[in-house]
Amino acid sequence: MSVLPTPLANQLLIALPALSDPTFSRSVALICQHDENGAMGVLVNRPSEYTLGEVLSQMGIDTVDEHLREQIVLSGGPVHPERGFVIHDDARDWDSSLEVGQGVYLTTSRDILEAMAAGEGPRNALVALGCAGWGAGQLEFELGENSWLTAPSDANVLFATALEDRWQTAAGRIGVDLFRLTDYSGHA
């Protein structure tokens, strides 16, 4: 029996410069679930090729909100790329929702998108297609290999920081300048 280290739900996972996998290089993921069976998160700084207007249209949801239609949908990760994930700050009882922690929620049901289209959705929301997943012990191994940093989730990083700045800003919240780190890591 292994003992699970502190669960990482509601943490930001920040790729270190040495992580060369193109899917995760310079990425920031919000860890939404983490237990002895593995972890699930959503990348929050990878734009997809889609706008929210295109996604809503494909779902048969109309909106007149031009800003909402132009919102970039994130590429949340390589797992279930056809599935939508909404990270937001609205505690309402959506059909399929999980409290990630400290006023941050993950919803996968259509009702939140319908509310957003009607102008009745969360004040702050990120919409992503796909997520990232780690098998049992995989994330812990990658952390031990110095592929990632962790930092507490931060609404400012999630909702008020430009996509292209989230990687550096998330690390800066814990005092790390990623541009001063080498691409090599080791163990003492």
Curated annotation (Swiss-Prot):
Name of the molecule in the record: UPF0301 protein XAC2918
PANTHER family named in the record: UNCHARACTERIZED PROTEIN YQGE, UPF0301 PROTEIN YQGE
Gene3D superfamilies assigned to the protein according to its UniProt record, in alphabetical order: VC0467-like
Family per record: Belongs to the UPF0301 (AlgH) family.
HAMAP family in the cross-refs: UPF0301
Pfam families per the UniProt record, alphabetical: DUF179
InterPro entries named among the record's database cross-references: AlgH-like
Domain of life: Bacteria
Any one annotated GO CC term: cytosol
Organism: Xanthomonas axonopodis pv. citri (strain 306)
